[in-house]
Curated annotation (Swiss-Prot):
It is a multi-pass membrane protein. Pfam families: Na_H_Exchanger, TrkA_N. One of its GO terms (cellular component) is plasma membrane. Keywords: Antiport, Cell inner membrane, Cell membrane, Ion transport, Membrane, Potassium, Potassium transport, Transmembrane, Transmembrane helix, Transport. It comes from Shigella boydii serotype 18 (strain CDC 3083-94 / BS512). The keyword Membrane applies. PANTHER family: K(+) EFFLUX ANTIPORTER 3, CHLOROPLASTIC. Residues 400-519 form the RCK N-terminal domain. This is Glutathione-regulated potassium-efflux system protein KefB.
Length: 601
């Protein structure tokens, strides 16, 4: 693809995303399905704007690479060790059982046994990109089903290596003798990457961060992600696995959050490009000729994987309310099938249209997942939000709540308990089904659902409520909900949780003035107690705390125009000097009235 063609393709991708995704969200079918439909529209079987699908699909796999790096940042080695049983237990069982069942079914449709084995393994894999994206959208990240789903996906990435090695053996084209020297060098290189990453990454990033230039830090992050991906690819291993390991090695470093911030925009764009590329690869010609075969294949594939996953979830002890979420989110074929089937085709394992039929089946199965998860959501909503008695009204709470609390994790629970203790009528919306189960056991009126859906908010009583308290874990969800409330329910007083200064700036820019940084107040209170233990009078420590709070809020507002700018550093230093001057000016006055308490007490 020439430079001008590549630029044109980039413009088309951006246009497709801008046009299709908002429309898909408005129709309620989700961003992922919007990307897939946009790919079909601009691909060779749609309007034909882009024909070189394979090259773009290979490039777009970087979206999965960036996603796995961010996931690695969220998992320290000890947490990964805790997941070892679910990774090598449930993960291995899912791949082996699904592959065996699907291979057997393929043999019944005139596939040679070698081709059926490869086809079964490829179809047994799930889409890492789609599953993780949907798990984040559905709030499954921290739930039991989400952790188990991630374990299965991680094992599938590990299974890529032996699966690719199996293809030439099945084709009868493998060398009679393994090159043990070559294999040994690859193992040594992999171990060297682990050791080097363990002891070199932190000092390198410390040196880069000392420069104070944000762009260099971002460049270093991109270099790490792309470099580790290319290194693993050169070893014949999974690129996504390489970046995941790099993320895990930095999970306990002081640069974890900065790394995540630097990489997040690239991850989102490239993931969108990946889904568009998958849509472009859908061969509508094969679909038209073999429509019945493809439809039956998609239904059978999804049904077999759901059955296997549901049974494994039950054996593993996953709550009944979460089993369908776990099974549904992993029910599709995955991007690895494109690589495995291409390798098998080059070894002439497939005959006629067999490879094309399998790829169409995989692509369409990916398109069914967002729709399937919507059905699961509706089923869960009816099961958990429905009437407990026959004469009760269905859905959520129809007694005109004063406050709607969105999110009922540790932060939201404190707020909810305080409001209920003061006899306030509240409706709580939570999209983590395990949290809904737990809180309902203790008598809380918590309802399952995604609060970014306008219909759910309206059903929850948003039109009659006075306030909404947003305590979402994800900043993106918080800002989306703020926008929805301002547009559809402008009368609501919006109060929000901010994870840090970045989110606080975004809330202020959106016009939300009532927010709380989750660690700020508790840190200030502990700081005040520390001052007292160091000999400062309680009144003096209290005033120091109040001054710091006022100055910090003033600085927060002043820095909005230069949000995420290097000028912020110099302004912060100036504010620190100003705070010291304020303390010095008032020390004399404080010493003269040590036993007094002011109006702010």
């Amino acid at each position: 693809m020439e430079g001008s063609d590549f630029l044109l393709a980039g413009v088309l991708f951006l246009f497709a995303a801008v046009a299709a995704v908002p429309l898909a969200s408005r129709l309620g079918i989700g961003a992922v399905l919007g990307y897939l439909l946009a790919g079909i529209a601009i691909g060779p079987w749609g309007l034909g704007f882009i024909s070189d699908v394979d090259e773009i699909l290979h490039f777009s796999e970087l979206g999965v690479v960036f996603l796995m790096f961010i996931i690695g940042l969220e998992l320290n080695p000890s947490k990964l060790w805790q997941l070892r049983r679910s990774i090598f237990g449930v993960g291995a069982a899912q791949v082996l059982l699904s592959a065996a069942l699907l291979a057997g079914l393929l043999m019944l449709t005139d596939f040679a046994w070698q081709a059926a084995v490869v086809g079964g393994i490829g179809l047994a894999m799930s889409s890492t990109a789609m599953a993780l994206q949907l798990m984040r959208e559905k709030g499954m990240n921290r739930s039991e089903s989400g952790q188990l789903g991630f374990s299965v996906l991680l094992f599938q990435d590990l299974a890529v290596i032996p699966a690719l090695a199996l293809v030439p053996l099945l084709a009868g084209s493998a060398d009679e003798h393994f090159d043990w020297m070559k294999i040994g060098m690859k193992v040594l290189a992999f171990v060297g990457m682990l050791i080097g990453g363990r002891y070199l990454l932190r000092p390198v990033f410390r040196f880069i961060a000392a420069s104070g230039v944000r762009e260099v830090f971002t460049a270093a992050t991109l270099l790490l992600v792309l470099g580790s991906a290319l290194f693993m690819d050169a070893l014949g291993l999974s690129m996504a696995l390489g970046t995941f390991i790099a993320g895990v090695l930095l999970a306990e470093s002081e640069y974890r959050h900065e790394l995540e911030t630097a990489i997040d925009p690239f991850k989102g764009l490239l993931l969108g490009l990946f889904f568009i590329s998958v849509g472009m690869s859908l061969n509508l010609g094969v679909l038209y000729i073999h429509l019945l075969w493809v439809v039956i294949s998609v239904v059978v594939l999804v049904a077999v994987k759901i059955l296997v996953l549901y049974l494994l979830a039950r054996l593993y002890g996953v709550r009944s309310s979460e089993r369908m979420q776990f099974a549904g989110v992993l029910s599709q074929g995955g991007e690895f099938a494109f690589v495995l089937f291409s390798t098998a085709s080059s070894q002439r394992l497939f005959q006629g249209d067999q490879m094309a039929l399998l790829l169409v089946t995989v692509t369409l199965s990916m398109m069914t997942t967002p729709l399937l998860m919507k059905l699961v959501d509706k089923w869960l909503s009816r099961q958990f939000n429905g009437p407990e008695e026959e004469d009760e009204k269905p859905w959520v709470n129809d007694d005109k709540p004063q406050v709607i609390v969105v999110g009922f994790g540790r932060f939201g629970q404190v707020i909810g308990r305080l409001l209920m203790a003061n006899k306030m009528r509240i409706t709580v919306l939570e999209r983590d089904i395990s949290a809904v189960n737990l809180m309902r056991k203790y008598g809380y009126k918590v309802y399952y659902g995604d609060a970014t859906q306008v219909d759910l908010l309206r059903s929850a009583g948003a039109e009659a409520a006075e306030s909404i308290v947003i305590t979402c874990n994800e900043p993106e969800d918080t800002m989306k909900l703020v926008e929805i409330c301002q547009q559809h329910f402008p009368h609501l007083h919006i109060l929000a949780r901010a994870r840090g200064r970045v989110e606080a700036h975004e809330l202020l820019q959106a016009g939300v003035t009532q927010f709380s940084r989750e660690t700020f107040s508790s840190a200030l209170e502990l700081g005040r107690k520390t001052l007292v233990t160091l000999g400062m009078h309680p009144h003096q420590a209290q005033r120091a705390q109040l001054h710091f709070r006022r100055l910090d809020m003033r600085m927060l507002r002043e820095l909005i125009p230069m949000h995420a700018d290097t000028v912020q550093i110099s302004r912060a230093r100036e504010a620190r000097r100003e705070l010291e001057e304020i303390f010095q000016r008032e020390m004399q006055q404080e010493r003269r009235q040590l036993d007094g308490w002011d109006e702010f007490e």
